[in-house]
Structure formats: C-alpha cells, structure tokens
C-alpha cells in the first residue's frame, strides 16, 4: 500500500470500522510482538512524550499514527505505571483536532501544576500551500484524564528560525520554570533555545537566548532536546541531525547524543564547563530519548527504539516501534550511566546458570561476567546453524561488537549491520535483555549501552556460546502480558 500524503493526513474520523478491524487483524499476525517492552496498540509508535509523575502515577505518552506503520497524522496515547515496568494504556489523550494542531500533535513534555498535568507540545499545522507552521501549544489533563486545550500559541515560530522548530521541554530549576525548544536557524544550522516562564505562568514564555552548550553548529537540526539534572549537574540530551562525523562518529541515520555540564547558568542561557559530545547508545536504534527529574530527584529516561526514515520488517503487519526500558541516569567518573530501574528485577520468574540453550522463549535477561584479557562470542536468537544476533566481547583489545547480519529479516543495511564501542581491558559485566524483537545491552551496569531491533526467523530462539568461557545467570522474564 502506498502511503500518499492524502492517506497519511486523512482525518481520524474518516477511517471506517472495517479498515480499523483489518489493521488489528493484520497486526495480530505479526510474529514480532514484544512481551515486556511498550509497543503500539496499532500502527506506529515513535517519540516518548510527557514523561512525568502525576496523581501518584508515572505517566508517559507515545506519539502514534494508529492506521499503519507510517508517519502520518500524529496523536498522543497515554500510558501509566506504578513501577515504571508495567504500563497500562489509558487511551488517546491528545488528538490533532484544533486549528493549532490540525496536522499532528508532535513531541513535547509535561509538568504538574496544581491538580492538573500541563502538556507542552508542538502543534503541526499545514496551510493551503502545504507550508508548515509549528506552534508550541499546551493542554491540561485533570486527574480523571480529561483534556482541556489552551486556546492560544504559547511560543510562536521565531523570526530567525525555519519551520523546523519543535519539541518543547519544560523543567524546573531552583523553583523557576524554564523550557527549551529545538530548532533550525535561517542558515540551516541547529540550535536549542531557552525560555523562561514569566511569574512561573506556563502560558507566558519569554526567550532568554540560545542555549550555550558549545554547539559545534554542524548539525542542521536539533531534535528532542532535554535538559535534565543528574545530581547537581546539567545533562543535555539531544538528536543533532546531520552532525558532522568528524565531530563524533556514528553509524545510524540520525544520532542521539549528550553533553554534561558542571552547572547551569539560566540567566545567561549557559551550561558551564561542558563535556565532550558522547553517544547515548551504541546500538542500531535509540532515538528521541526523553528524560525528566522525578519528585525524588532521580533522573529517569526512556527512548524510542526506532528511527525516522527507516522501513522495518514489521511494517507489513501494520506496526512499528517500541519503547526502551525505563532507565535511571547517574554520573560516574564524568560518564553518563544508564541502567534499567530496579523494578525490572520483579520480572525475573526463574534463574539458572548461563549455558548454551537449544531453545528459549526469547524473553529473558542474562547477567554475564567476562574475565579480563578474555575473548568471548555469544549468539542470541540462534538457530541450529548458530546464526543469530552475535555479541563479541574482546577484552584483549577493549571492544564490544554487536552483529545482526544473521539475525532474521534484514533492513537498513545501508547503515551497516554491526555496531561497536570501546571499553576498558578489564573484567566486565553485561546485562542483556532479549524481548522477541528487541535487545538492550548494558555494559558495566550502564557505562555503555547498545539497543536495537531484530526480526528473527521462527527457528531463531537459542543461545550459543561460540567462543570463550563467559559465566553468569539466565533469568526467564514474565511480564504477565500475553504475546503471540
């Protein structure tokens, strides 16, 4: 089926019940549904939005096009959780149904004000000449989940920006509310702009200036900027589209990166003593990471395990995209560590010593120990011939390599089928989460992370130790959710 512009932007109410039922039936045939990762009820899931804590629950929304695996007319679907591991979908909350968001409810953030959750997002509007008008707008969600949209533009497109201006993130710094928005200037260079809420009024914003984070100005657009505080240190997470690979090498179509500062100077829109740019994730898919500071001060994050402008094998079943596990962010020795929240251990249903396994249910966690100066290769999602997802731990040369070239149906091969990162040549741990069509690998409790999708064949469900003598524990995971 061809996704024409007309079809992508067809009004929600114009889709028939028969068409929707056909989409659901097709999606049910997919062999790649996840068990403990969030996936869309139908269609496409992309950016996490509005990650927050409200009315005693963790809240996050996913951007959704419910009518197929395509980027079309977007809405926000709400999820809520008591533990950041089990999420319940409570329905579509932000629809593209006003003149300020008629062509899509794009990405944004959330913050509690009184008895309401303030949703701050980009309304995507196209005029009769199909020219885009990005409006930073808002809505209030009460404790019953009712949405009331704020009927005015909160931040308009600046005169010095193209129509690529989006993804507002609201945050609190020392009792004052601020927001950052990603954009592209008239020279087609990416920037992040800082705003201040006048009298802490979330409907009244004043520009402070472009955030100074030692921007190298090689990216043409800054998507999904998030400023979060890890301890006292500001950490800027962002997606610099088009970043020059001489600045920092990466393999994916678009990168997701971060910088750490020693302090934040909002009056001068400055991150002080900014670190070198670093990759957030060394795998094949991790994008649009959203983070916020929880009421207890922890910095929590979640990512879209998918990428723009990539076709996936699951597309033919009318679904695409999952979320990563929710991770807690910490800083150790100047490095950002990302590791799943402690409640993930509650999924462990059984444990056994790690060994070769002819067959698994492809929903498990491995906790591995690798000795210094050792070399090991393990194949996950392995078939009888030993083909699958290969992970090579080379602690002689200090490198980890992930190879998905023999793991099921291939896609996005023009961006390579291997990913690697450097690690210290010393004893190393790895926590590896496999979930049907998702893998997440955490080296040394989150010092380095690899995330990605794989679409294994039906007979790819074993574990093979191809070389070396890694030891550890195999945990079968049970989320309680039915998958096919």
Task: Label each region the model flagged.
Residues 1-103, 107, 111-167, 172-218, ...:
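Beta-rich carbohydrate-recognition and catalytic domains
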């Amino acid at each position: 089926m061809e996704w024409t512009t007309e079809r992508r932007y067809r009004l929600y109410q114009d889709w028939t019940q028969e068409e929707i039922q056909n989409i659901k039936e097709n999606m049910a045939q997919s062999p790649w549904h996840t068990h403990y990762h969030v996936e869309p009820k139908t269609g496409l899931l992309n950016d996490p939005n509005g990650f927050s804590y409200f009315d005693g629950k963790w809240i996050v929304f996913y951007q959704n096009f419910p009518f197929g695996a395509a980027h079309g007319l977007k809405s926000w679907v709400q999820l809520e959780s008591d533990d950041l591991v089990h999420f319940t979908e409570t329905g579509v909350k932000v629809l593209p149904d006003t003149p300020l968001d008629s062509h899509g409810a794009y990405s944004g953030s959330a913050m509690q004000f009184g008895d309401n959750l303030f949703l701050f997002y980009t309304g995507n509007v196209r005029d009769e000449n199909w020219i885009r008008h990005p409006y930073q707008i808002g809505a209030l969600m009460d404790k019953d989940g009712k949405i009331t949209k704020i009927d005015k533009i909160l931040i308009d497109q600046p005169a010095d920006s193209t129509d690529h201006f989006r993804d507002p993130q609201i945050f609190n710094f020392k009792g004052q509310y601020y927001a950052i928005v990603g954009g592209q200037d008239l020279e087609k260079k990416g920037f992040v702009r800082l705003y201040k809420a006048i009298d802490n009024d979330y409907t009244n914003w004043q520009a402070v200036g472009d955030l100074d984070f030692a921007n190298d100005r090689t990216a043409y657009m800054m998507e999904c900027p998030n400023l979060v505080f890890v301890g006292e240190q500001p950490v800027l997470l962002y997606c610099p589209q088009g970043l020059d690979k001489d600045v920092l090498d990466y393999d994916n179509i678009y990168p997701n990166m971060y910088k750490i500062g020693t302090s934040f100077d909002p009056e001068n829109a400055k991150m002080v003593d900014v670190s070198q740019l670093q990759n957030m994730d060394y795998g094949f898919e991790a994008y649009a990471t959203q983070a916020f500071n929880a009421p207890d001060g922890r910095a929590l994050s979640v990512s879209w395990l998918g990428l723009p402008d990539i076709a996936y094998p699951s597309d033919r079943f009318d679904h695409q995209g999952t979320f990563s596990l929710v991770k807690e962010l910490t800083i150790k020795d100047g490095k950002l560590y990302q590791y799943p929240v402690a409640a993930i251990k509650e999924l462990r249903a059984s444990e056994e010593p790690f060994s070769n396994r002819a067959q698994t249910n492809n929903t498990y966690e491995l906790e591995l120990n690798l000795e210094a100066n050792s070399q090991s290769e393990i194949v996950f999602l392995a078939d009888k011939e030993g083909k699958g997802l290969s992970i090579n731990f080379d602690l002689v040369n200090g490198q980890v390599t992930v190879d998905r070239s023999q793991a099921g149906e291939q896609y996005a091969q023009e961006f390579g089928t291997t990913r690697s990162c450097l690690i210290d040549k010393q004893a190393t741990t790895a926590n590896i989460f496999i979930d049907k069509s998702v893998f997440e690998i955490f080296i040394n409790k989150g010092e380095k992370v690899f995330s990605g999708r794989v679409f294994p064949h039906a007979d790819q469900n074993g574990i093979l130790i191809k070389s070396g003598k890694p030891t550890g524990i195999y945990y079968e995971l049970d989320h309680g959710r039915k998958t096919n």
